[in-house]
Amino acid sequence: MASSCTAFRACAALTAALVLFLIAYVLIKGIPNISWEFLSTKPSYLTDSVGILPDILNTLYIVLGTLVWVLPLGVGAAIYLTEYASNHRIVGAIEYAAETLSGIPSIIYGLVGMLFFCNFLGFQTSLQAGAMTLVIMNLPTVMRTTQESLKTVPQSLREGAFGLGAGKWRVIRTVVFPGCVDGIITGCILAVGRILGESAALLFTAGFAHNIYNIFVDGLSGAGATLTVALYVYAKEQGDFEIAFAIAAILMALTVIINLVATLVGKYYQKRRSI
């Protein structure tokens, strides 16, 4: 028994050491190359300067453009399947399909997005095509996460509310949602992290351009590189690893912040619910 515990501790320590080494290596390589000019300007080949402001804005546009569609669709589908649908066989088939779609490599979504959104629908290579591709890619995850959160609410609470004369939607809004809102919000925040870190699908659909767009004038019709795509371009195509590590450090910091926010939000609602 003692030897088993020692082995598990060694595995845990090794895993933690590898993660810490990776984080430290990226930060040490990347942070010295980050400056205000680097964050607030766009690249210029005339002055040989590098800036990632277009990539930051394009990342923000992609995240917002994806969330606008994936959150209402994913949460709405989960509510219907969990609270309204009566044919359990169809519900099971949809859940199985969602689980399968969640495991498909993102580059396949990129290929499908390029053929459907860019070519068939005529979006061309654009942020709009990239956002819609990420909607399809993240919809199963948001739906299943919300479903699992809804299922954590005891059925007795629903039955008690029905017994008091509450309607279906009122029960969902006043009983079910408050009982699982922490899980739903946490799942949505983690979906933001997945959108933020996506690159393969966007290589096919959103393009590599370092352009700044006015979203209120141009919408998402122009091509643009996100931070992850820019990292690939600088590291693989241009061999500029200093810039690549700087972008990697920024992405790593954003990922840590997103996971921290998800944890804090979950704990806040759990504490509020227990009062």
Locations of the language-model features?
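Transmembrane-helix boundary motif in ABC transporter permease subunits
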Residues: T66-A98, L111, A262-Y268
